[in-house]
Amino acid sequence: MPTYRSRTTTEGRNMAGARALWRATGMTDGDFQKPIIAVVNSFTQFVPGHVHLKDLGQLVAGEIAAAGGVAKEFNTIAVDDGIAMGHDGMLYSLPSREIIADSVEYMVNAHCADAMVCISNCDKITPGMLMAALRLNIPTVFVSGGPMEAGKVKLGDGEHALDLVDAMVMAADDSVSEEDIELVERSACPTCGSCSGMFTANSMNCLTEALGLSLPGNGSVLATHSDRQNLFKRAGHLIVDLAKRYYEGDDESVLPRSVATYDAFENAMTLDISMGGSTNTVLHLLAAAHEAGVDFTMQDIDQLSRRVPVLCKVAPAKNDVHMEDVHRAGGIMGILGELDRAGLLKTDVSTVHAPSMSAALNEWDVVRNENHHEFYRAAPGGIPTVFAFSQSRRYRELDTDREAGVIRSAEHAFSQDGGLAVLYGNLAEDGCIVKTAGVDESILKFSGPARVFESQDASVDAILSGEVKEGEVVLIRYEGPRGGPGMQEMLYPTSYLKSKGLGKACALVTDGRFSGGSSGLSIGHVSPEAAEGGTIGLVETGDLIEIDIPNRTIHLAVPDAELAARRQKREEEGWHPAEPRPRKITAALRAYASMTTSASRGAVRNI
């Protein structure tokens, strides 16, 4: 029978000092025999996805106390990728994932907490906390802050739904008036919550449902809706139950590593492919699997991508569909239900809230059970706000149309080819990733001359000045985990290509990564990266690059002898950008670069 970890600090004569300190936090004699639950919050006023979390930790804490536990809250950092985008701030985004994971480990292990509720939301916070949960392997429940409502704006022929990416694209389009840009800017992000499309934050929060570590609705209930309050309350009660089942009942099935097994990771990736999730999820799932000791690799993702269809298209792949629409169609449990009916889901895996995924789907899939139809009718309020649970509006009816609705059955899939693909070839021997759900069918096969840039900044200048021409492959290198360092997101280059009318006329290839808001023929995570001696570091402007998504290949059409000669020269001169970059690399970033690994391994640390 496992012993409560917290008893290390609450029992025995030699812990009198520790108990004295616990008492100073408000604990009483009766509390020392209760499970101590860490409430891992990530409130910050810098990030709209986290601005409303300030009081939610204490909401969970109150429920933990009511259920017989003791809650102790602390905070992690949280970087807003949208605000950090387009300047050196983005160098810190991916490294913050490791800092978050470490900070959770430090706090939980230093104070011997028995279990955790992780209150996350945005891009690197959910992955960082997920890595920590699997590293620590103590009972854990995830509950996120929830998606933002989609913006609404009246332009031209009527009202349009929009999001952050629309504002970025329009701002770079010279044909759009200053007045319209201001209107879109003021309308794109109307409420608190994670950005409203299937970007990285929402993708990861959805995947926690598939992994079995969060409650149904975690990925799709709007931040503003009162139904999300119930998720926080239920999480508080659930975590105490899980802690008692483990420490008092020796039930190891509730532990994160027992829930997030290889099959669960397959389910999560299957979901991601079926809904065209962010390519960043590949990076984060690989890192989480590493922490869990699960042998889940790029090769597994490649195999899944070849047999999982696209059942749901959400912005940026489909501009008029946002997370509120996914929820109305049955949320993540609705998509998982369709995957199950197609024979693509492992349903004997356990979850924190149900004995199996099969049992969870029997209860929460709107097609097979009407018990929670009201829950999935939760609608946006349409009123700008920074407050959680501020409205209770509901749609009159659900979207259960599986032929032409937001969520499709496998028979009526948007595409039988999955929403993500892994490409291999001499340009990416260890693989690279493309979000096929955002690629127009006309350019699934694409060949063109490379236009090489040694940084994201240089590519942006060239795109905006009109130097990049139709048919070219924009190649941005030395932006990988080590070369950046920090593996910047390339949302600005992809957005600016769209604004210049080149979204379907050019490709973009990089050893960096892409925002979940990116679309078009955007190929990232090229591995090995340039800074590690990857072939991407040998490409010269004018070289022909051949991309074949249906056959999963990417090829640099340069003779092997020429590549060998270029490699010898590069080995002599060093693997670094050919042109100097005005980029300040601090000691913190240098430390990250010295330990990080390739994107094909999830950019985990090699220590």
From Swiss-Prot:
UniProt keyword annotation of Lyase present: yes
Gene3D superfamilies: IlvD/EDD C-terminal domain-like (3.50.30.80)
Swiss-Prot/TrEMBL catalytic activity: (2R)-2,3-dihydroxy-3-methylbutanoate = 3-methyl-2-oxobutanoate + H2O; (2R,3R)-2,3-dihydroxy-3-methylpentanoate = (S)-3-methyl-2-oxopentanoate + H2O
GO biological process terms, semicolon-separated: isoleucine biosynthetic process; L-valine biosynthetic process
Binding annotation for [2Fe-2S] cluster: 122, 195
Signal peptide residue numbers: none
Active site: 515 (proton acceptor)
The keyword Hydrolase belongs to this UniProt entry's keyword annotation: no
Entry's cofactor comment: Binds 1 [2Fe-2S] cluster per subunit. This cluster acts as a Lewis acid cofactor.
Catalytic activity, EC: 4.2.1.9
Binding site for Mg(2+): 81, 123-124, 489
One GO MF term attached to the UniProt entry: dihydroxy-acid dehydratase activity
PROSITE patterns xrefs: ILVD_EDD_1, ILVD_EDD_2
Pathway: Amino-acid biosynthesis; L-isoleucine biosynthesis; L-isoleucine from 2-oxobutanoate: step 3/4; Amino-acid biosynthesis; L-valine biosynthesis; L-valine from pyruvate: step 3/4
Source organism, top-level taxon: Bacteria
Alphabetically ordered keywords of this record: 2Fe-2S, Amino-acid biosynthesis, Branched-chain amino acid biosynthesis, Iron, Iron-sulfur, Lyase, Magnesium, Metal-binding
GO CC annotation terms, alphabetical: cytosol
Cofactor(s), by name: [2Fe-2S] cluster; Mg(2+)
Residues that bear N6-carboxylysine: 124
Role description: Functions in the biosynthesis of branched-chain amino acids. Catalyzes the dehydration of (2R,3R)-2,3-dihydroxy-3-methylpentanoate (2,3-dihydroxy-3-methylvalerate) into 2-oxo-3-methylpentanoate (2-oxo-3-methylvalerate) and of (2R)-2,3-dihydroxy-3-methylbutanoate (2,3-dihydroxyisovalerate) into 2-oxo-3-methylbutanoate (2-oxoisovalerate), the penultimate precursor to L-isoleucine and L-valine, respectively.
Subunit annotation: Homodimer.
Family: Belongs to the IlvD/Edd family.
Family annotation (PANTHER family): D-XYLONATE DEHYDRATASE, D-XYLONATE DEHYDRATASE YAGF-RELATED
Protein name, per record: Dihydroxy-acid dehydratase
Gene name, Swiss-Prot/TrEMBL: ilvD
